[in-house]
Amino acid sequence: MRGVVKELNDDGFGVLGNVLVPFSAPGDEVEILKIEKVKKAKIASKWKLIKSSPLRVGARCKVFGRCGGCSLQHLSYDYQLEFKGERIRRLLGVDVEVIPSPRIFGHRNRIDLAVTVEGIGFRERGKWWKIVDIQECPVFGKTSRKAIERLREFIEEERISVWNVKKDEGFLRYMVLREGKFTGEVMVNLVTKEGKLPDPSKYFDFATSIYWSVNRTKSDVSYGEVESVWGREFITEKLDDVIYLIHPNSFFQTNSYQAVNLVKKVSELVEGERVLDMYSGVGTFGIYLAKRGFKVVGFDSNEFAIEMARKNAKINKVDAVFDVATDREVEVNGFDTVIVDPPRVGLHPKLIKKLNREKPEVIVYVSCNPKTFARDIEKLEYKIDEIVALDMFPHTPHLELVAKLIV
């Protein structure tokens, strides 16, 4: 089968007839050599590029096309933004500005590297059992090269057994790297099964903090029961004038440079004085707003996230209040603005009913999933007053939406 790729679907796959062509560009002339059926989709698992699209650029990553991390690195950044804007236009029927990421390489502040008999790196696209060995991750930056080199030395010199994914054997499973892009602080977290970890401190002497996490379950996860091995308990990140503590088991926006624009945009859309910060996490929005004089109350169902939010409030010397509660339990009356930043599944139906009943003046909806955002907007008795998209995830199809909703 031979032809010209017409467009990209929402997942960033090129479309040629009824076949999806990964890592292709609109305007590419391709010859499909092998097709595999994945669920209900036909995927070109092997294809040849006959003539390149003018939208193509050289990928900076040496393993691009195999690694499952980035899927759009072969496209010009201008076109990536155009593609994301068109995706939102198709979904919502409105033109939305897509704010570009201030940096498109070295922007990620976290990567979870599998440590296996095949190598150190990420899973191959569509193959959970295969790991693509890497020397450096360009979207994380130069610290990744140093950390991977030191990890190889640590494994070899200390004779550490590493993960055999297919057999589910081996001691050392993951290395999670986190970096404060505005502070330069680095955290190395080594994730293992039960056993004894040799002292890693001399190998990772560039790190601010070294942790050992033990995964005692059968689940394939890059976290566990944590123990501080060396250095500080937390690293820090700074967004404008706000400091945030980073712990191995706490969530933080993965693109620090664009996160500055995100918190600024949310603060611009807030009205009134009293703000309810739903799904507050570690207080990313709430503390930024409290620093600017808003009276903030935040809730999250994750106890550890709330513990971190309280610590962040304390170090920033703000009076924001954070408590543990589910989205179904929180009372929304008495607030001028309600911020909602739900997980990818979107808002709980009971919360939607509560918002429709109590009618806070303004809702600021932050979404990492445009599809569930569109679904929730249909159910909320509000209209979109302002909406913008932020490219938090360059070289992927994903983006963040921020909308101001009014009655």
Swiss-Prot record:
Enzyme Commission no: 2.1.1.35
Function description: Catalyzes the formation of 5-methyl-uridine at position 54 (m5U54) in tRNA.
Molecular-function GO terms, alphabetical: 4 iron, 4 sulfur cluster binding; metal ion binding; tRNA (uracil(54)-C5)-methyltransferase activity, S-adenosyl methionine-dependent
Family according to the record: Belongs to the class I-like SAM-binding methyltransferase superfamily. RNA M5U methyltransferase family.
Substrates-to-products reaction catalysed: uridine(54) in tRNA + S-adenosyl-L-methionine = 5-methyluridine(54) in tRNA + S-adenosyl-L-homocysteine + H(+)
Binding residues annotated for S-adenosyl-L-methionine, in chain numbering: 253, 279, 284, 300-301, 327, 341
Residues that bind [4Fe-4S] cluster: 61, 67, 70, 137
Protein name, as recorded: tRNA (uracil(54)-C(5))-methyltransferase
Key word Manganese present: no
PROSITE patterns per the UniProt record, alphabetical: SAM_MT_RNA_M5U, TRMA_1, TRMA_2
Record-linked PANTHER family: RNA M5U METHYLTRANSFERASE, TRNA (URACIL(54)-C(5))-METHYLTRANSFERASE
Active site: 368 (nucleophile), 400 (proton acceptor)
Keywords: 4Fe-4S, Iron, Iron-sulfur, Metal-binding, Methyltransferase, S-adenosyl-L-methionine, Transferase, tRNA processing
Gene Ontology biological process: tRNA methylation
Superkingdom of source: Archaea
Keyword tRNA processing set for record: yes
